[in-house]
């Protein structure tokens, strides 16, 4: 087998592994971004723990098929970049959506969230969600509210009995 074919097979395997392992994958069209804008986008994604790479569409199609995500192939036309996140589901959608608001050249095409294909509208909806830490803090405050109210009610009853006894 030729060296070129081996290299391409390694890339296909790499992409397929990333597709399987990532919790969130977003496909974007980066055509029209300047080098400085692309660098800024990569920096923001890196800070959010997201890997951002450009692959040949033919190799990405093969990887999507081997990862059983063939429905992603219809979005793999033109110059594409793919953002992979293995930790936070919301991070790539949030960073890319915010960047796309400021830079019209960046176009979000579709994504795969936890193995399910999502459209542009669904990616934008996911981008508006708070991060996992934000959701956990909201949950914690909801769980603490009844305990706090019970403590305040108990204190109020104790204060009232103290006033009556005095």
Swiss-Prot record:
According to the UniProt record, one GO cellular component term is: large ribosomal subunit
Functional note? Forms part of the ribosomal stalk, playing a central role in the interaction of the ribosome with GTP-bound translation factors.
According to its UniProt entry, the protein's GO biological process terms are:
translation
Alphabetized, the UniProt keywords read:
Ribonucleoprotein, Ribosomal protein, RNA-binding, rRNA-binding
Is Disulfide bond there in the keyword field? no
Q: What organism is recorded for this protein?
A: Bacillus anthracis
Q: Which residues form a coiled coil?
A: none
Recorded protein name is Large ribosomal subunit protein uL10
Q: Which PROSITE patterns match?
A: RIBOSOMAL_L10
Asked if the record carries the keyword Membrane, the reply is no
The record's comment on protein family reads: Belongs to the universal ribosomal protein uL10 family.
The disulfides recorded in the entry are none
């Amino acid at each position: 087998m030729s060296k070129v074919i081996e290299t391409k097979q390694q890339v296909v395997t790499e992409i397929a592994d990333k597709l399987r392992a990532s919790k969130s994958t977003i496909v974007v069209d980066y055509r029209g971004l300047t080098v400085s804008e692309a660098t800024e986008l990569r920096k923001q994604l890196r800070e959010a723990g997201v890997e951002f790479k450009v692959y040949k569409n033919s190799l990405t199609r093969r990887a999507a098929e081997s990862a059983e995500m063939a429905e992603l192939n219809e979005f793999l036309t033109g110059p594409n970049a793919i953002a992979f996140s293995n930790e936070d589901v919301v991070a790539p959608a949030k960073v890319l959506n915010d960047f796309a608001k400021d830079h019209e050249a960046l176009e979000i095409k579709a994504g795969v969230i936890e193995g399910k294909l999502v459209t542009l509208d669904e990616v934008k909806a996911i981008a508006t969600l708070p991060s996992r830490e934000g959701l956990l803090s909201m949950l914690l405050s909801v769980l603490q509210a009844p305990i706090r109210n019970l403590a305040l009610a108990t204190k109020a009853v104790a204060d009232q009995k103290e006033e009556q006894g005095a």
